[in-house]
Amino acid sequence: MAPYRVVAVSEGLAERVRTSRKSPGYGHPAHSELATGYGPCRLCLRDFEVGVERRLLFTLDPFHGFETFPLPGPVFIHEEACDRYPEDAGFPPDLLSHDLTVAAYARGRVLRAEERVGAGEAEGAVGRLLARGDVDYLHVRDTEAGCYDFRIERA
């Protein structure tokens, strides 16, 4: 078991988007498309099967309910139901091959540090950033697109 928790979007949020076809908190229409890129799905944290799976694109504020200052952006989930990534399963295997940005925050959404990492380097960055006493949680983002992937908290 990892010394941290991987926090994907909630099943309730994903179901609301699938049912309403709207972005939570914004009401923007969710867009359905055949996957043209790898992803990942923000619920199961698996890469999409390009040209095979359908996905929903919608606006998400990853700080909603957690911090007051919003930072909305585009994210994807599978159009069909999938299982939420287990919080205690460690770093999502599909994302280990991605170029990622790991942002370290203190409460109040104060950015303390940020590391941009290549394939296979994410777990080291997570360990280094969580070892800092001034860091409360991490956000993992796709470096190329800048999109939010998931949050990491200490276990």
Where in this protein do the model-derived segments appear?
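Short, hydrophobic/π-rich interface segment
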Residues: T101-Y137, R141, R154
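C-terminal edge-of-domain segments
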Residues: Y148-A155
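Polar/acidic, low-complexity leader/linker segments enriched in S/T/G and N/D
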Residues: M1-E11
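A contiguous, low-structure linker/loop signature
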Residues: D94-L95
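N-terminal, charged amphipathic alpha-helical interaction modules
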Residues: V9-F91, L100
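Short Gly/Ser/Thr- and Asp/Glu-enriched loop/turn motifs at secondary-structure junctions
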Residues: T143-C147
